[in-house]
Amino acid sequence: MKYNFDEVFPRKGSASVKHDLMKPFFGTEDLMPMWVADMDFKAPECVLDAIRKRCDQGFLGYTFGDDSYFGAVIDWFAKHYSIKAEKRELHYIPGIVVGIAFCIQAFTKPGDKILINTPVYPPFVNLPINNGRELITNKLILKNGRFEIDFEDLEQKSKGCKMMLLSNPHNPGGTVWSRNDLVRIAEICKRNGVLVISDEIHADLTLPNYKHTSFSTVSESAKSNCITFIAPSKTFNIAGLSSSIAYIPEKSIRDTYFEYLEASEFANGNIFAYIGAEAAFSGGEEWLSQLKDYLVENIAFADDYFKRNLPKIKAVLPEASYLLWLDFNGFGLSHDELQHRLINKAKVALNNGVTFGGNDYAGFFRMNIGCPRSILKEALDRIANAFADVR
């Protein structure tokens, strides 16, 4: 089957965070939404059909993850991550951010140090602080348009930390960390008593010619000292189903985490979380393959557009996902002026780079290009027009 990713669908008025909740963040709703990591493509038909079938049954009562659900998860893990997971090592989680919050509460106490690499997905910055932990930052190095880890700094910063939050693949840069990168992280963290929480939500959006490596697979040091989170939400554009999975191969870590969940009376998810995930993992592979081809074309289109029309914007092109990390500092304008132009002249909503790790990322913005190409072109045209006088 050939999927049409060029088709444009009206999403305004559907209580979409991306489309209908811009005013609290940008002061206006009159913007093109190129911010929240939510694609403007319909979910795979296999997912929609499975949900319709259950709705037609007429019963929407309490539901648990059955063997069919876990079988689909285990098969996907084996095929795509080379993980031989067992059901007892897995637990449903409503969302990875919530799952990480549970980790912070279960394994650390107020005042403990938690390590992150910046720039990084804003909840990695916010969760430790909001839970009364001390945030320690290891600043990534941007080299030849790609992020690299400063391992000397990581070694020093990890001492005294209780936990490291790892974005694998990296958000916002889209970097697919190499096996060697992950081995070194595992060795450093194991040596210094730092539990690694690996957020692998963008793993299945690793683009052709790149290979995702799941953290737990790189060494015994990694496998025995981590919690890995995976989700079909970004992959199949079903974030609203609140369906994620925690994978914990080490029994002592698993027992502590599961005991925390039990003490919190956290058990089962909503009915469509299981149905949607199982359908996606069982029948969504062809859709995903074509989606990734389309995303590659979108990335190439945006890259060419910047080079021809907006050469002062430097883009970090992703190896995974549909997010571009954009450096606007070439315009010589303050961060506030850049933001003002984007909102008031371009009327385009981009994620503010400062939220990814502080003022080191002033002048940077994250752009979501998981949309029909006509939408992408219009957004780029708007940005070009808004900055025409400072080119």
What are these regions (language model features)?
Residues 278, 294-303, 315-328:
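Conserved glycine-rich beta-strand-loop-beta hairpin in the small C-terminal domain of fold type I
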Residues 2-95, 102, 280-281, 390-391:
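N-terminal small-domain helix-loop-helix segment of the aminotransferase-like
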Residues 131, 191-192, 222, 346:
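Helix C-cap/helix->beta junction micro-motif
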Residues 49-50, 220, 224-296, 304, ...:
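Conserved core segment of the aminotransferase class I/II
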Residues 222, 341-350, 356-391:
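PLP-dependent enzyme catalytic core of the Aspartate aminotransferase-like
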Residues 60-187, 204-205, 212-217, 221, ...:
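Conserved core of the PLP fold type I
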